[in-house]
């Protein structure tokens, strides 16, 4: 038979023992904390264990990161907005310029080519026309000029070229009138070879526009051209 009195007494003893143990444990930790044996919890851990909605004012962070001046914030916003506007304007301008360059007008295309009437040019004379901002020499050569141009030994030339490679019609020589040395304009019907002479540094070109003497490294450049009719020349 079960003795309820004995069980109740045992339960009381157990409960009292647990209370004593709990009190001993709590008191032991408290005394250990007071004596410095248990370190303080880090602030982050303490904040998690004891959450609070109170705003803590940190004077140290306030000194390191002072609040901004409203006028300065407005100025920074103004500068940032203005910079974005300028950047967008530049991008728009570049795109517009690219589109316009891709669709050249008739005036631009007309300047890219030049039509010349050759009927008024006498044999043995040279005329100068302007094409793309550069002078172009057009010489109507005589039979003697043609024979002289074809009698040159190519081995003696600095920039070897046959006369036939530089003309489309033996009677007409078309070259850009810019010295290949430093860009001066040579004088026609001058020099030691009856062609052109550059007064800047003394380069001599023959009747085919080939460099024969002086510092120029290359012959006078031959532009792109074609004959529209017998007396019509299209440069470009």
Swiss-Prot record:
One of its GO terms (cellular component) is mitochondrial inner membrane. InterPro entries: Rieske_2Fe-2S, Rieske_2Fe-2S_sf, Rieske_Fe-S_prot, Rieske_Fe-S_prot_C, Rieske_TM, Ubiquinol_cyt_c_Rdtase_Fe-S-su. One of its GO terms (molecular function) is metal ion binding. [2Fe-2S] cluster binds at residues 179, 181, 198, 201. Residues 97-236 are mitochondrial intermembrane. Signal peptide: none annotated. CDD domains: Rieske_cytochrome_bc1 (cd03470). The Rieske protein is a high potential 2Fe-2S protein. This is Cytochrome b-c1 complex subunit Rieske-4, mitochondrial.
């Amino acid at each position: 038979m079960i003795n309820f009195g004995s069980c109740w007494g045992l339960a009381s003893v157990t409960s009292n023992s647990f209370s004593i143990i709990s009190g001993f444990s709590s008191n032991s930790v408290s005394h250990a904390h007071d004596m410095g044996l248990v370190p303080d919890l880090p602030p982050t851990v303490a904040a998690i264990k004891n959450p609070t909605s109170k705003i803590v004012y940190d004077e140290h962070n306030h000194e390191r990161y002072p609040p901004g001046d409203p006028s300065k914030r407005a100025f920074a916003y103004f500068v940032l907005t203005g910079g974005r506007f300028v950047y967008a304007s530049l991008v728009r301008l570049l795109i517009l310029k690219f589109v316009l360059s891709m669709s050249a007008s008739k005036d631009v295309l007309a300047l890219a080519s030049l039509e010349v009437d050759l009927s008024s040019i006498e044999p043995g004379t040279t005329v100068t026309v302007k094409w793309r901002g550069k002078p172009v020499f057009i010489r109507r050569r005589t039979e003697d000029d043609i024979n002289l141009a074809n009698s040159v030994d190519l081995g003696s030339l600095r920039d070897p070229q046959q006369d036939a490679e530089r003309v489309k019609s033996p009677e007409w020589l078309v070259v850009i009138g810019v010295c290949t040395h430093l860009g001066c304009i040579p004088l026609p019907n001058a020099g030691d070879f009856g062609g052109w002479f550059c007064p800047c540094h003394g380069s001599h070109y023959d009747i085919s526009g080939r460099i024969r003497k002086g510092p120029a490294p290359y012959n006078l450049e031959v532009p792109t051209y074609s004959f529209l009719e017998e007396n019509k020349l299209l440069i470009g």
